[in-house]
Amino acid sequence: GAAILTNDNAMDALQDL
């Protein structure tokens, strides 16, 4: 996922973990 820039990207960032 992308960096946390928006609320929509928050879940994508968790997947990057």
Curated annotation (Swiss-Prot):
Key words, A-Z: Bacterial flagellum, Secreted
Transmembrane feature ranges: none
GO CC annotation: bacterial-type flagellum; extracellular region
Principal location class: secreted
Subcellular location: Secreted; Bacterial flagellum
Function: Flagellin is the subunit protein which polymerizes to form the filaments of bacterial flagella. Flagella are an important component in the invasiveness of B.bacilliformis.
Family statement drawn from the similarity comment of this UniProt entry: Belongs to the bacterial flagellin family.
Name of the featured protein: Flagellin
Lineage of producing organism: Bacteria, Pseudomonadati, Pseudomonadota, Alphaproteobacteria, Hyphomicrobiales
